[in-house]
Protein backbone atom coordinates (compact mmCIF):
# COMPACT_ATOMS: atom_id res chain seq x y z
CA UNK A 1 0.00 0.00 0.00
CA UNK A 2 2.90 2.32 0.77
CA UNK A 3 4.26 1.98 -2.77
CA UNK A 4 0.93 2.86 -4.38
CA UNK A 5 0.41 5.80 -2.03
CA UNK A 6 3.88 7.16 -2.71
CA UNK A 7 3.79 6.78 -6.48
CA UNK A 8 0.22 7.73 -7.08
CA UNK A 9 -0.60 11.44 -6.96
CA UNK A 10 -4.35 10.91 -6.76
CA UNK A 11 -6.24 8.59 -4.45
CA UNK A 12 -9.69 7.06 -4.82
CA UNK A 13 -12.49 9.01 -3.21
CA UNK A 14 -14.84 6.10 -2.74
CA UNK A 15 -15.78 5.66 0.96
CA UNK A 16 -15.51 1.90 0.72
CA UNK A 17 -12.05 2.16 -0.85
CA UNK A 18 -10.94 4.63 1.82
CA UNK A 19 -12.25 2.35 4.55
CA UNK A 20 -10.44 -0.57 2.95
CA UNK A 21 -7.21 1.47 2.81
CA UNK A 22 -7.53 2.68 6.38
CA UNK A 23 -8.10 -0.78 7.79
CA UNK A 24 -4.64 -1.93 6.78
CA UNK A 25 -1.87 -1.91 9.35
CA UNK A 26 1.57 -1.09 7.98
CA UNK A 27 3.75 -3.29 10.17
CA UNK A 28 1.63 -6.43 10.14
CA UNK A 29 3.48 -7.70 7.11
CA UNK A 30 6.98 -8.99 6.52
CA UNK A 31 9.53 -6.39 5.42
CA UNK A 32 11.75 -7.47 2.57
CA UNK A 33 14.12 -5.94 0.08
CA UNK A 34 13.18 -6.17 -3.59
CA UNK A 35 15.87 -6.16 -6.31
CA UNK A 36 16.19 -3.48 -8.93
CA UNK A 37 15.35 -5.60 -11.93
CA UNK A 38 12.32 -7.34 -10.53
CA UNK A 39 10.43 -9.20 -13.20
CA UNK A 40 6.78 -8.59 -13.57
CA UNK A 41 4.53 -11.34 -12.38
CA UNK A 42 2.67 -12.98 -15.29
CA UNK A 43 -1.01 -13.37 -15.15
CA UNK A 44 -1.68 -10.39 -12.82
CA UNK A 45 -3.98 -7.62 -14.02
CA UNK A 46 -1.80 -4.89 -12.49
CA UNK A 47 1.97 -4.57 -12.35
CA UNK A 48 4.22 -2.18 -10.52
CA UNK A 49 7.87 -1.22 -10.25
CA UNK A 50 9.61 -0.07 -7.10
CA UNK A 51 12.80 1.94 -6.70
CA UNK A 52 15.96 0.17 -5.67
CA UNK A 53 16.25 -0.18 -1.93
CA UNK A 54 12.57 0.47 -1.34
CA UNK A 55 10.73 -1.36 1.37
CA UNK A 56 7.58 -3.27 0.65
CA UNK A 57 5.37 -2.86 3.68
CA UNK A 58 2.17 -4.44 2.41
CA UNK A 59 0.86 -6.38 -0.56
CA UNK A 60 -1.37 -4.87 -3.17
CA UNK A 61 -4.40 -3.62 -1.32
CA UNK A 62 -6.22 -1.04 -3.45
CA UNK A 63 -8.30 -1.96 -6.50
CA UNK A 64 -6.35 -1.96 -9.74
CA UNK A 65 -9.02 -0.05 -11.59
CA UNK A 66 -8.90 2.90 -9.21
CA UNK A 67 -5.09 3.35 -9.20
CA UNK A 68 -3.36 5.16 -12.07
CA UNK A 69 -0.67 3.40 -13.99
CA UNK A 70 2.71 3.42 -12.29
CA UNK A 71 5.34 5.72 -13.77
CA UNK A 72 8.38 4.19 -15.36
CA UNK A 73 11.45 3.82 -13.17
CA UNK A 74 14.39 6.15 -13.72
CA UNK A 75 17.63 6.21 -11.68
CA UNK A 76 17.48 10.00 -11.39
CA UNK A 77 14.00 9.95 -9.90
CA UNK A 78 13.88 11.92 -6.65
CA UNK A 79 13.13 10.03 -3.48
CA UNK A 80 9.46 9.59 -2.78
CA UNK A 81 7.69 9.76 0.53
CA UNK A 82 8.16 6.04 1.05
CA UNK A 83 11.06 6.51 3.49
CA UNK A 84 9.06 9.06 5.50
CA UNK A 85 6.08 6.74 5.44
CA UNK A 86 8.19 3.81 6.65
CA UNK A 87 9.74 6.02 9.35
CA UNK A 88 6.31 7.07 10.56
CA UNK A 89 5.14 3.48 10.53
CA UNK A 90 8.18 2.25 12.47
CA UNK A 91 7.75 4.93 15.15
CA UNK A 92 3.98 4.70 15.42
CA UNK A 93 3.51 1.05 14.66
CA UNK A 94 -0.22 1.05 14.62
CA UNK A 95 -1.35 4.39 13.25
CA UNK A 96 -5.13 4.26 13.29
CA UNK A 97 -7.23 7.18 12.05
CA UNK A 98 -9.88 6.44 14.68
CA UNK A 99 -7.25 6.66 17.44
CA UNK A 100 -6.38 10.20 16.17
CA UNK A 101 -10.01 11.13 15.57
CA UNK A 102 -9.23 11.82 11.89
CA UNK A 103 -11.33 11.53 8.83
CA UNK A 104 -10.23 9.09 6.11
CA UNK A 105 -9.01 11.98 3.95
CA UNK A 106 -6.90 13.40 6.80
CA UNK A 107 -5.48 9.96 7.52
CA UNK A 108 -4.42 9.47 3.91
CA UNK A 109 -2.90 12.95 3.77
CA UNK A 110 -1.02 12.25 7.00
CA UNK A 111 0.26 8.95 5.61
CA UNK A 112 1.57 10.37 2.36
CA UNK A 113 3.10 13.35 4.20
CA UNK A 114 1.51 16.05 2.00
CA UNK A 115 -0.13 17.91 4.92
CA UNK A 116 0.63 17.99 8.65
CA UNK A 117 -1.55 16.05 11.00
CA UNK A 118 -4.35 18.29 12.32
CA UNK A 119 -4.03 17.09 15.90
CA UNK A 120 -0.83 16.39 17.84
CA UNK A 121 0.17 12.78 17.91
CA UNK A 122 -0.42 10.97 21.11
CA UNK A 123 2.06 8.69 22.83
CA UNK A 124 2.92 5.25 21.55
CA UNK A 125 0.98 3.56 24.33
CA UNK A 126 -2.10 5.55 23.40
CA UNK A 127 -1.90 4.31 19.82
CA UNK A 128 -1.32 0.79 20.94
CA UNK A 129 -4.17 0.67 23.43
CA UNK A 130 -6.53 2.45 21.06
CA UNK A 131 -5.59 0.12 18.24
CA UNK A 132 -6.10 -2.87 20.47
CA UNK A 133 -9.49 -1.52 21.52
CA UNK A 134 -10.39 -0.78 17.92
CA UNK A 135 -9.56 -4.28 16.73
CA UNK A 136 -11.61 -5.79 19.51
CA UNK A 137 -14.68 -3.71 18.69
CA UNK A 138 -14.27 -3.56 14.88
CA UNK A 139 -13.21 -7.01 13.72
CA UNK A 140 -11.97 -7.08 10.12
CA UNK A 141 -14.50 -5.10 8.08
CA UNK A 142 -12.46 -5.59 4.91
CA UNK A 143 -12.86 -9.35 4.81
CA UNK A 144 -16.35 -9.02 3.49
CA UNK A 145 -15.55 -6.11 1.19
CA UNK A 146 -17.49 -6.91 -1.95
CA UNK A 147 -16.60 -4.57 -4.71
CA UNK A 148 -15.04 -1.51 -6.28
CA UNK A 149 -13.92 -3.54 -9.26
CA UNK A 150 -11.96 -6.20 -7.38
CA UNK A 151 -12.76 -9.83 -7.99
CA UNK A 152 -13.26 -12.27 -5.16
CA UNK A 153 -10.09 -14.15 -6.09
CA UNK A 154 -7.90 -11.03 -6.00
CA UNK A 155 -9.46 -9.92 -2.76
CA UNK A 156 -9.04 -13.37 -1.25
CA UNK A 157 -5.38 -13.47 -2.21
CA UNK A 158 -4.72 -10.26 -0.28
CA UNK A 159 -7.26 -10.52 2.48
CA UNK A 160 -6.37 -14.00 3.66
CA UNK A 161 -2.65 -13.31 4.18
CA UNK A 162 -3.64 -10.13 5.94
CA UNK A 163 -6.11 -12.11 8.02
CA UNK A 164 -3.35 -14.60 8.87
CA UNK A 165 -0.88 -11.90 9.86
CA UNK A 166 -3.53 -9.96 11.66
CA UNK A 167 -4.34 -12.88 13.92
CA UNK A 168 -0.70 -13.59 14.52
CA UNK A 169 0.14 -10.00 15.33
CA UNK A 170 -2.92 -9.15 17.43
CA UNK A 171 -1.83 -11.14 20.54
CA UNK A 172 1.27 -8.94 21.21
CA UNK A 173 -0.84 -5.96 22.42
CA UNK A 174 -2.68 -8.23 24.84
CA UNK A 175 0.56 -9.92 25.85
CA UNK A 176 2.21 -6.53 26.21
CA UNK A 177 -0.74 -5.31 28.21
CA UNK A 178 -0.70 -8.35 30.46
CA UNK A 179 2.79 -7.59 31.91
CA UNK A 180 1.64 -4.01 32.39
CA UNK A 181 -1.37 -5.33 34.28
CA UNK A 182 0.87 -7.64 36.23
CA UNK A 183 3.29 -4.85 37.17
CA UNK A 184 1.28 -3.60 40.19
CA UNK A 185 1.12 -7.15 41.52
CA UNK A 186 4.75 -8.00 40.76
CA UNK A 187 6.40 -4.84 42.09
CA UNK A 188 4.99 -4.99 45.65
CA UNK A 189 6.24 -8.56 45.90
CA UNK A 190 9.76 -8.45 47.30
CA UNK A 191 12.64 -9.83 45.31
CA UNK A 192 15.55 -11.79 46.79
CA UNK A 193 17.46 -8.67 47.83
CA UNK A 194 14.32 -6.98 49.05
CA UNK A 195 13.46 -10.11 51.05
CA UNK A 196 16.86 -10.07 52.73
CA UNK A 197 16.52 -6.36 53.39
CA UNK A 198 12.99 -6.86 54.72
CA UNK A 199 14.23 -9.67 56.94
CA UNK A 200 16.99 -7.47 58.24
CA UNK A 201 14.56 -4.59 58.66
CA UNK A 202 12.07 -6.87 60.39
CA UNK A 203 14.77 -7.89 62.84
CA UNK A 204 15.84 -4.28 63.31
CA UNK A 205 14.29 -4.05 66.76
CA UNK A 206 15.85 -7.34 67.84
CA UNK A 207 19.24 -7.13 66.15
CA UNK A 208 21.02 -6.37 69.42
CA UNK A 209 18.87 -8.93 71.20
CA UNK A 210 19.74 -11.63 68.71
CA UNK A 211 23.13 -12.19 70.36
CA UNK A 212 23.73 -12.28 74.07
CA UNK A 213 26.56 -10.31 75.65
CA UNK A 214 28.56 -13.44 76.30
CA UNK A 215 28.17 -14.54 72.67
CA UNK A 216 29.25 -11.15 71.38
CA UNK A 217 32.31 -11.12 73.63
CA UNK A 218 33.34 -14.71 73.01
CA UNK A 219 32.61 -14.67 69.24
CA UNK A 220 35.45 -14.03 66.82
CA UNK A 221 35.30 -11.20 64.30
CA UNK A 222 35.06 -13.55 61.31
CA UNK A 223 32.22 -15.52 62.85
CA UNK A 224 30.42 -12.32 63.80
CA UNK A 225 30.71 -11.00 60.23
CA UNK A 226 29.29 -14.26 58.91
CA UNK A 227 26.29 -13.96 61.25
CA UNK A 228 25.75 -10.30 60.36
CA UNK A 229 25.19 -10.90 56.63
CA UNK A 230 21.89 -9.44 55.48
CA UNK A 231 21.79 -6.66 58.05
CA UNK A 232 22.17 -3.00 57.21
CA UNK A 233 25.41 -1.13 57.68
CA UNK A 234 24.07 0.93 60.57
CA UNK A 235 22.94 -2.18 62.41
CA UNK A 236 26.32 -3.85 61.90
CA UNK A 237 28.15 -0.75 63.13
CA UNK A 238 25.87 -0.49 66.14
CA UNK A 239 26.29 -4.17 66.99
CA UNK A 240 30.08 -4.02 66.60
CA UNK A 241 30.18 -0.90 68.76
CA UNK A 242 28.19 -2.75 71.39
CA UNK A 243 30.62 -5.66 71.14
CA UNK A 244 33.55 -3.26 71.51
CA UNK A 245 31.90 -1.63 74.51
CA UNK A 246 31.27 -5.02 76.08
CA UNK A 247 34.85 -6.04 75.41
CA UNK A 248 36.17 -2.83 76.95
CA UNK A 249 33.84 -3.26 79.88
CA UNK A 250 34.96 -6.86 80.30
CA UNK A 251 38.58 -5.83 80.05
CA UNK A 252 38.03 -3.11 82.64
CA UNK A 253 36.23 -5.55 84.90
CA UNK A 254 39.04 -8.06 84.45
CA UNK A 255 41.65 -5.44 85.30
CA UNK A 256 39.65 -4.30 88.30
CA UNK A 257 39.23 -7.88 89.44
CA UNK A 258 42.95 -8.49 89.05
CA UNK A 259 43.73 -5.35 90.99
CA UNK A 260 41.37 -6.38 93.76
CA UNK A 261 42.86 -9.85 93.85
CA UNK A 262 46.36 -8.44 93.97
CA UNK A 263 45.35 -6.05 96.71
CA UNK A 264 43.92 -8.88 98.78
CA UNK A 265 47.06 -10.89 98.20
CA UNK A 266 49.27 -8.01 99.24
CA UNK A 267 47.16 -7.37 102.30
CA UNK A 268 47.43 -11.02 103.28
CA UNK A 269 51.18 -10.94 102.81
CA UNK A 270 51.38 -7.75 104.86
CA UNK A 271 49.41 -9.33 107.66
CA UNK A 272 51.64 -12.37 107.61
CA UNK A 273 54.75 -10.20 107.65
CA UNK A 274 53.42 -8.15 110.54
CA UNK A 275 52.77 -11.33 112.44
CA UNK A 276 56.25 -12.56 111.68
CA UNK A 277 57.71 -9.23 112.86
CA UNK A 278 55.80 -9.51 116.10
CA UNK A 279 57.05 -13.02 116.55
CA UNK A 280 60.60 -11.89 115.89
CA UNK A 281 60.23 -9.05 118.34
CA UNK A 282 59.02 -11.44 120.95
CA UNK A 283 61.95 -13.70 120.20
CA UNK A 284 64.37 -10.81 120.50
CA UNK A 285 62.92 -9.77 123.83
CA UNK A 286 63.16 -13.33 125.09
CA UNK A 287 66.74 -13.58 123.97
CA UNK A 288 67.50 -10.26 125.60
CA UNK A 289 66.08 -11.49 128.88
CA UNK A 290 68.11 -14.68 128.67
CA UNK A 291 71.21 -12.62 127.94
CA UNK A 292 70.60 -10.45 130.92
CA UNK A 293 70.07 -13.48 133.10
CA UNK A 294 73.25 -15.09 131.87
CA UNK A 295 75.12 -11.84 132.45
CA UNK A 296 73.95 -11.54 136.01
CA UNK A 297 74.81 -15.14 136.67
CA UNK A 298 78.21 -14.66 135.12
CA UNK A 299 78.89 -11.68 137.33
CA UNK A 300 77.82 -13.62 140.41
CA UNK A 301 80.09 -16.47 139.49
CA UNK A 302 82.98 -14.13 138.95
CA UNK A 303 82.56 -12.47 142.36
CA UNK A 304 82.24 -15.75 144.21
CA UNK A 305 85.42 -17.18 142.63
CA UNK A 306 87.53 -14.14 143.58
CA UNK A 307 86.56 -14.41 147.20
CA UNK A 308 87.42 -18.08 147.38
CA UNK A 309 90.86 -17.41 145.95
CA UNK A 310 91.66 -14.69 148.50
CA UNK A 311 90.66 -16.74 151.56
CA UNK A 312 92.80 -19.70 150.66
CA UNK A 313 95.97 -17.61 150.33
CA UNK A 314 95.71 -16.12 153.91
CA UNK A 315 95.16 -19.43 155.74
CA UNK A 316 98.15 -20.62 158.00
CA UNK A 317 97.52 -24.24 157.30
CA UNK A 318 98.94 -24.04 153.85
CA UNK A 319 102.31 -25.69 153.22
CA UNK A 320 103.82 -22.41 152.11
CA UNK A 321 103.09 -20.90 155.49
CA UNK A 322 105.33 -23.43 157.17
CA UNK A 323 108.11 -22.88 154.78
UniProtKB/Swiss-Prot annotation:
Residues 54-77, 192-201 have a biased composition (Low complexity). CDD domains: bZIP_Maf_large. PROSITE patterns: BZIP. There is a cross-link at residues 32, 297 (Glycyl lysine isopeptide (Lys-Gly) (interchain with G-Cter in SUMO)). GO terms for molecular function: DNA binding; DNA-binding transcription activator activity, RNA polymerase II-specific; identical protein binding; protein-containing complex binding; RNA polymerase II cis-regulatory region sequence-specific DNA binding; sequence-specific DNA binding. InterPro entries: bZIP, bZIP_Maf, bZIP_sf, Maf_TF_N, TF_DNA-bd_sf, Transcription_factor_Maf_fam. One of its GO terms (biological process) is segment specification. Residues 129-143, 159-168 have a biased composition (Basic residues). Transmembrane segments: none annotated. One of its GO terms (cellular component) is RNA polymerase II transcription regulator complex. Keywords: Activator, DNA-binding, Isopeptide bond, Nucleus, Proto-oncogene, Repressor, Transcription, Transcription regulation, Tumor suppressor, Ubl conjugation. Pfam families: bZIP_Maf, Maf_N. SUPFAM superfamilies: A DNA-binding domain in eukaryotic transcription factors (SSF47454), Leucine zipper domain (SSF57959). SMART domains: BRLZ (SM00338). It is found in: Nucleus. Sumoylated. Sumoylation on Lys-32 and Lys-297 stimulates its transcriptional repression activity and promotes macrophage differentiation from myeloid progenitors. Residues 238-301 form the bZIP domain. Expressed in pancreatic alpha-cells (glucagon-positive cells), in podocytes of the kidney and macrophages (at protein level). Most abundant in kidney, gut, lung and brain. Residues 266-287 are annotated as: Leucine-zipper. Disruption phenotype: Mice show a defect in frequency of respiratory rhythm with a fatal apnea at birth due to lack of neurons from the preBoetC region. They displayed renal dysgenesis with abnormal podocyte differentiation as well as tubular apoptosis. They show altered actin-dependent macrophage morphology. They show a reduced number of cells expressing insulin and glucagon. Embryos also lack the abducens nerve which normaly innervates the lateral rectus muscle that is involved in eye movement. PANTHER family: TRANSCRIPTION FACTOR MAF, TRANSCRIPTION FACTOR MAFB. The leucine-zipper domain is involved in the interaction with LRPICD. This is Transcription factor MafB.
Amino acid sequence: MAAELSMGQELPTSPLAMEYVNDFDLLKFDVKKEPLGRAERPGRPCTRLQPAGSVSSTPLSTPCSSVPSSPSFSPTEPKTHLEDLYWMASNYQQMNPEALNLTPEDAVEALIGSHPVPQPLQSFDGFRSAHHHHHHHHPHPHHGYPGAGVTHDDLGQHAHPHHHHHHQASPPPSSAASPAQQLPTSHPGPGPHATAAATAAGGNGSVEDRFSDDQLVSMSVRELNRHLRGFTKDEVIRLKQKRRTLKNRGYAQSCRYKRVQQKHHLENEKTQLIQQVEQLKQEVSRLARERDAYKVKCEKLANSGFREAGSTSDSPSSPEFFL
